[in-house]
Amino acid sequence: MLGRPIGLPKTGVFALMDLIGIDLIPKVGESLQSRLDQEDPFHKISGPGEDIIMSMIEEGNTGRKGKGGFYRLNRDDGKKVKEARDLSSGEYRKANRKAAFPSAKMGKRGLSALMDCDDDGARFVTDVLLDTLAYAAFIVPDVSDDIYSIDG
């Protein structure tokens, strides 16, 4: 859901974090927190999921450069099998490539088709995009004197 339709690589968010390195997530977060004003909305999002990230790092599950991350490749009878981490249990199981929401299939038709859907997946994507765009608008004065300089 959080991939190409919203302008991210086709890997999606979690596979992208595996590629970059999960061990970098807390370092980037700490760096941002130390440099941002206290009223910056970024401070509100730090924390959720932190326990999962830290336990993954402690286990050596730092992504592709480690034993795995949110995903890992395993071998079964000589064939590569993609596994996904269950965020509740921490166990890996065969990745289910079937879309969980009808809106996920609509994403192939573009963002507006995805957002026109009425399911939890589309609502999640809409919430993420609205929060992201609101944050981008909030930081415009720190980046530029006007929005036109950014957009042009």
Question: What are the residue ranges of the model-derived segments?
Answer:
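N-terminal glycine-rich phosphate-binding loop for ADP-containing cofactors
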Residues: 1-152
